[in-house]
Amino acid sequence: MKQTITEKIFSDHVGKEVSAGEIIESKIDMIIGNDITTPISIKQFERSGAKKLANPDGFAIVMDHYIPTKDILSANQAKISREFAYKHDLKNYFDEKDMGIEHAILPEKGLVIPGDVIIGADSHTCTHGALGAFSTGMGSTDLAYAMITGKNWFKVPESIKVVFKGKLDKHVYGKDLILEIIRQIGVDGALYKALEFSGEVIDGLSMDDRFSMCNMAIEAGAKSGIIAVDEITKEFLKDKNLRDKPKFFYSDEGAKYDKILEIDVTNLDPVIAYPFLPSNGKSVRQAVRDDLAIDQAFIGSCTNGRLSDLRIAAQILKGKKVARKTRLIITPATQKIARAAEKEGLIDIFIEAGAVVSNPTCGACLGGYMGILGANERCISTTNRNFVGRMGDRTSEIYLANSAVVAASAIAGKIADPRDL
């Protein structure tokens, strides 16, 4: 039987050939929880009477949403995960001493391996498919079941193959490719499907761009996003202390897809997702014509808080100043990224431009803290969601864009095209 990469990964984990639509129970290689979702899983774990984790080395808790804690409620919530991690002597526990957003720090630490089946109690767990793994978000109760048994059930998803052709223009990145897909198919256009990204454009993308694309697969309703391993993937993995030996799977020629989409990127401009859906994509040229003044610009999150994003922003901000009526917040996705940015002089560039540089956190993205929007404020952001009230007041607006667009807009005080600078 001809199989997709997703079908092959599940076949490997189940021990028999499986195809899309089958209900299976699969071994889980890595379980991911955070300070918001893990306490619920811990409660269910303890309620079950379980005394130990099925696979302690395959469970990671990443404290990233409200860390350092912002108030008493978040402090007490974090305490639950901390005590559980210490009680079970978790090796893969990441807190203030080694901070990072979960979907950035796990690949950085070598905890995501090609061929894995990964689940996380966070919808953007699909990020890790960029490394040729099947990775998806689940609820906290599902997480608890996997903590106890080391397994979980799935319906093997059908796949949509997206083939990118052409050549990217300057300041067009992986973020723009995924926003363009979502613009074309809508927020439910890939419902419970595996979005498989391929083509000559993907072959030339950095890992950071690939992570951005897979991260936002869920915004099209997808169960996962996935990119087959190539030399760029292998180079990324080369110096990592990998948890286990990787397995490389590739879709067969003639494998069955729900649909195959071909996108020519030759004339693609940077894409801006207008409020209040990621599918509301428009060209940056349209946004410039709309003359949209901004109160806040944000660069960070599990979508675009990586080192390449900071380098892009620094190139644009160097020697410039953030507009007087605009705030620019920059949040490196991990401590390692922050330290690398500091060594390269990027942090100095940001501060001299008038930006605020924060510790790694999900805070602003989910409207938790460190960048909440007030009534009727407008923000251009590298994050992944722009729903009503996502980053603050329900009357505020979020425009999603790549790091270059956000940096250029911070200087202009309104949404700007970095190619015009």
Swiss-Prot record:
UniProt name for this protein: 3-isopropylmalate dehydratase large subunit
Keyword annotations of the record: 4Fe-4S, Amino-acid biosynthesis, Branched-chain amino acid biosynthesis, Iron, Iron-sulfur, Leucine biosynthesis, Lyase, Metal-binding
Family statement drawn from the similarity comment of this UniProt entry: Belongs to the aconitase/IPM isomerase family. LeuC type 2 subfamily.
Listed Gene3D superfamilies: Aconitase, domain 3
Superkingdom of origin organism: Bacteria
Binding, [4Fe-4S] cluster: C302, C362, C365
Pathway: Amino-acid biosynthesis; L-leucine biosynthesis; L-leucine from 3-methyl-2-oxobutanoate: step 2/4
Cell division as UniProt keyword: no
Record-linked HAMAP family: LeuC_type2
Function: Catalyzes the isomerization between 2-isopropylmalate and 3-isopropylmalate, via the formation of 2-isopropylmaleate.
An individual GO BP term: L-leucine biosynthetic process
GO molecular function term, any single one: 3-isopropylmalate dehydratase activity
Quaternary structure, from the entry: Heterodimer of LeuC and LeuD.
Pfam families: Aconitase
Cofactor note: Binds 1 [4Fe-4S] cluster per subunit.
